[in-house]
């Protein structure tokens, strides 16, 4: 397989490049009969799209989605759903100086050695532009999961560069370009980003994502454990270099008396497991975090080599996000939704008739 398809029963195959005519995806396995329109998909695409603030790339893309197939008279038919998003604001001349060189931290070097050819315009297939159709596909998954189980998704940025962002309220997240759950820290974040751009540099970020009202039983041990699939999905997002589930690396310093989530008739007393035990969802919130590296495309000159192996200095021009993490929250939600959608269908197919006693306890005792 060439690595362009995600999922087992609910599959998403993406296509296109950053500076091609269009990008898109084909979704297979969506159950029939669900009411669906472009408006159901556009909301999340608008949350992810570029050009929405001075702190992200100024490439102006409307990211307007077109449904080409799989929907008839406003309902899904159970056949493949094709989504198309046309590229409208390519500026390929910005990449003329890197066609024969390799940008440090980018996929240029590895794509060249793997395929023997590469598209240097905006990173081609390796561009984060290709997360747009993924977000579109996940909007369909989110809608189905909400209607079937009441499952909802939310995320926020919890760190920008060196600045930790204390959590205040989810209510703040939709009201700022950073997806920050803290309103008072916004001036500091804006000043930090302005300094980065002025100095021709970039930074990383940490994104937290949560799924609520997740049914118990999702996950396929041993090799398709739910937390393993979530980690796999989040690591597949551009620039992600680390993933935590639940307490994550904090688990190292915890004692067993602290880490193990106690069960009571009223619910779980804590959620260090992040909603997954033995690779199977517990019915608690699924919680995960991901670390995003600094953007590799910066205006500061860096050492590299050209295709002939000669030493050179590389400066990257063009319109780039000084922190790709600023627009990553909807993408993290999307990948989590695709995992849960796929596993919901897999669980329903094999274990949909299973009933045990006692019934599941509440997600939380608090």
From Swiss-Prot:
Assembly behavior: Homotetramer.
Species, as recorded:
Herminiimonas arsenicoxydans
Keyword Flavoprotein among record annotations: yes
Top-level enzyme category: lyase
Name the gene that codes for it. aroC
List the Gene Ontology MF annotations in alphabetical order.
chorismate synthase activity; FMN binding
Chain positions recorded as FMN binding sites? 125-127, 238-239, 278, 293-297, 319
Specify the taxonomic lineage: Bacteria, Pseudomonadati, Pseudomonadota, Betaproteobacteria, Burkholderiales
Give the source's domain of life in one word: Bacteria
The protein's annotated catalytic reaction(s) are: 5-O-(1-carboxyvinyl)-3-phosphoshikimate = chorismate + phosphate
Give the record's pathway.
Answer: Metabolic intermediate biosynthesis; chorismate biosynthesis; chorismate from D-erythrose 4-phosphate and phosphoenolpyruvate: step 7/7
Which keywords does this Swiss-Prot/TrEMBL entry list?
Answer: Amino-acid biosynthesis, Aromatic amino acid biosynthesis, FAD, Flavoprotein, FMN, Lyase, NADP
Q: What does this protein do?
A: This reaction introduces a second double bond into the aromatic ring system.
Instruction: Show the GO cellular component annotation of the record.
Output: cytosol
Q: Does the keyword Flavoprotein apply?
A: yes
EC nos: 4.2.3.5
Which cofactor is essential here? Answer: FMNH2
Q: Which GO terms describe its biological process?
A: amino acid biosynthetic process; aromatic amino acid family biosynthetic process; chorismate biosynthetic process
Q: Which positions in this protein are listed as binding NADP(+)?
A: 48, 54
Family per similarity comment = Belongs to the chorismate synthase family.
List the protein's name: Chorismate synthase
Q: How is the cofactor bound?
A: Reduced FMN (FMNH(2)).
